[in-house]
A protein has these predicted regions:
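A local structural motif
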Residues: 1-3
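Glycine-rich beta-strand-centered segment in the early N-terminal region that forms part
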Residues: 5-22, 35-78, 100
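Conserved hydrophobic "DFG−1" position in protein kinase catalytic cores
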Residues: 6, 30, 95-96
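Cytochrome P450 core scaffold surrounding the K-helix E-X-X-R motif
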Residues: 25-32
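A generic structural signal for secondary-structure junctions
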Residues: 33-34, 128
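NAD(P)H dinucleotide-binding glycine-rich loop of Rossmann-like/cofactor-binding domains
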Residues: 40, 74-139
């Protein structure tokens, strides 16, 4: 292990300061069977897909989130088109595509929010700007 550089948000991305992460089944499967899955990954790499924390940076074109907002996110660094260690959740700061993040109400802990992206993948995409007020008041 080594320190990871602070990632910058690009267009349509946010940077989340992680307060909780969840172990997605793909994370332990990748570690168990190695390059039989995600063989395109370039190392060094940071695994982890599901996280929750606060937005610390927003990229251009992001209008749904502001710095300081509590969010959950589904990081897709293992996606063949992304292949980015900055998008792995097992670190202090994670880059997440804005459409794969959702507001987290104050009544929901970060630990509980971090486990939502795996069983509910449509959740972040469903919390569009038209519904974000509903998403921010109910878990």
């Amino acid at each position: 292990m080594a320190p990871a550089p602070y990632p910058r948000a690009r267009e349509n991305e946010i940077v989340i300061r992680n307060r909780a992460v969840a172990i997605n089944p793909l994370d332990w499967i990748k570690q168990s069977i190695g390059d039989l899955i995600f063989s395109w990954i370039r190392y060094p790499f940071v695994l982890g897909a599901d996280c929750a924390g606060e937005v610390v940076e927003v990229g251009d074109s992001v209008t749904r989130f502001a710095v300081g907002v509590r969010v959950l996110g589904h990081a897709v660094g293992t996606d063949r088109k992304r292949n980015s260690a900055a998008e792995g959740a097992f670190q202090h700061y994670t880059v997440v595509l804005a459409h794969l993040a959702a507001p987290v109400p104050d009544s929901l802990s970060y630990e509980d929010a971090a486990v939502l992206p795996w069983p509910c993948p449509p959740l972040p995409a469903g919390c569009s700007s038209r519904t974000s007020s509903a998403c921010s008041t109910r878990p």
